[in-house]
């Protein structure tokens, strides 16, 4: 399971050399609030001049390598600034950033990962607000009150189905339709999607929603698989005819390659924000601010071309075509124990 608080505590517990960490902190880059919050007509010029001197930046991300390569290459071409990328799962991104900071090591400039992990970094005071002019272009839900990380794109949980095994006209219209015996042995779900579960149950009503999913699992069974990429591939292969929680962009990417897969939404579709944030002690602050701006501007069109859902209002996306409910990462972080336990008890442990 994704235990955000536990992951953070584990990373902090590993720091045993307190004296060495304190000495390292004294040599750390300065707080970059002034650069991050720079405004004015000459802002862009000052950022570019500073970034040219810094020459590079370091970027931690949990997004797929191929997708992020498109963005970093475009940034490098535009500014001539080298982007050093380290990619891992969202939990490992969080652990590495927190561990390095506690050790007084500040290598990373920008982090891009799931909303709950970004919220932990905010609460640990590792991020800084960037007063980007491109914030005005984003949907309101992309901007949290503290503004220390911004949702640059969304992971939208959708249903995925194998088009050779299931006809579009036969798809379920609601979660209640999943009680139909025709779905027996055909359903699949990802093993750690308790945040999706909390959003769906919130829409259905807690008592009604929990009973419904208990009944669905008891009646028709459900196959639990770890990893959205694996689950999506199993839908395409036909091993899982219908999955409840695939990311729409993953299904779209396979569909565009000719795989027999498509996606649909149970209204409202549940959306998890993915965020971008600048580190308060980024070693390359001017380059970091430029990259932050880039993620909210030029990168939005590039993300769309990679079948992601960007948050800019200037980009036409499925946001305009379906009702969407946004998961609040602050709520998920605070209520993780409750929803993780319910998801395990009702879905994972009862899976067939």
Predicted regions and their residues:
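Periplasmic-binding protein-like
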Residues: 24, 137-141, 154-155, 183-192, 213-218, 222-225, 294-315, ...
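Immediate post-signal peptide segment of exported/extracytoplasmic ligand-binding proteins
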Residues: 26-58, 76-77, 179-184
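Extracytoplasmic ligand-binding site segments that recognize negatively charged/polar headgroups
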Residues: 58-72, 84-101, 106-239
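A ligand-binding cleft/hinge motif common to bilobed small-molecule-binding domains
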Residues: 117-120, 241-260
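A bilobed periplasmic-binding-protein/Venus flytrap-type ligand-binding module shared by bacterial periplasmic
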Residues: 158-165, 201-203, 272-287, 303
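Extracellular/periplasmic juxtamembrane helices and adjacent flexible linkers that interface
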Residues: 298-352
């Amino acid at each position: 399971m994704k235990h955000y608080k536990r992951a953070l505590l584990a990373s902090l517990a590993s720091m045993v050399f307190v004296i060495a960490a304190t000495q390292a902190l004294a040599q750390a880059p300065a707080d970059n609030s002034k650069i991050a919050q720079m405004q004015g007509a000459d802002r862009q010029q000052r950022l570019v001049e500073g970034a040219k001197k810094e020459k590079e930046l370091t970027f931690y991300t949990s997004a797929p390598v191929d997708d992020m390569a498109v963005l970093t290459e475009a940034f490098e071409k535009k500014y001539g600034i080298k982007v050093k990328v380290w990619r891992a799962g969202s939990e490992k991104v969080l652990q590495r950033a927190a561990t390095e900071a506690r050790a007084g090591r500040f290598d990373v400039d920008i982090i891009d990962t799931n909303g709950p992990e970004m919220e932990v970094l905010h609460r640990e005071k590792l991020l800084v607000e960037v007063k980007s002019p491109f914030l005005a272009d984003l949907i309101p839900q992309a901007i949290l009150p503290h503004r220390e990380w911004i949702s640059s794109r969304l992971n939208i949980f959708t249903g995925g189905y194998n088009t050779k095994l299931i006809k579009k006209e036969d798809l379920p219209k609601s979660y209640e339709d999943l009680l139909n015996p025709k779905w027996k042995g055909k359903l699949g779900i990802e093993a750690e999607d308790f945040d999706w579960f909390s959003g769906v149950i919130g829409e259905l009503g807690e008592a009604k929603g929990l009973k419904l999913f208990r009944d669905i699992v008891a009646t028709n069974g459900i196959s639990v698989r770890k990893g959205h990429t694996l689950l999506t591939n199993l839908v395409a292969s036909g091993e899982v005819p219908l999955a409840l929680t695939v990311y729409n962009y993953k299904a779209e990417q396979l569909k565009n390659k000719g795989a027999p897969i498509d996606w649909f939404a149970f209204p409202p579709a549940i959306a998890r924000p993915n965020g971008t944030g600048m580190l308060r002690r980024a070693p390359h602050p001017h380059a970091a601010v430029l990259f932050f701006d880039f993620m909210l501007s030029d990168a939005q069109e590039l993300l769309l071309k990679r079948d992601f859902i960007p948050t800019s209002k200037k980009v036409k996306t499925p946001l305009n075509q379906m009702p969407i409910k946004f998961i609040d990462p602050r709520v998920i972080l605070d209520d993780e124990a409750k929803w993780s336990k319910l998801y395990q008890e009702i879905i994972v442990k009862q899976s067939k």
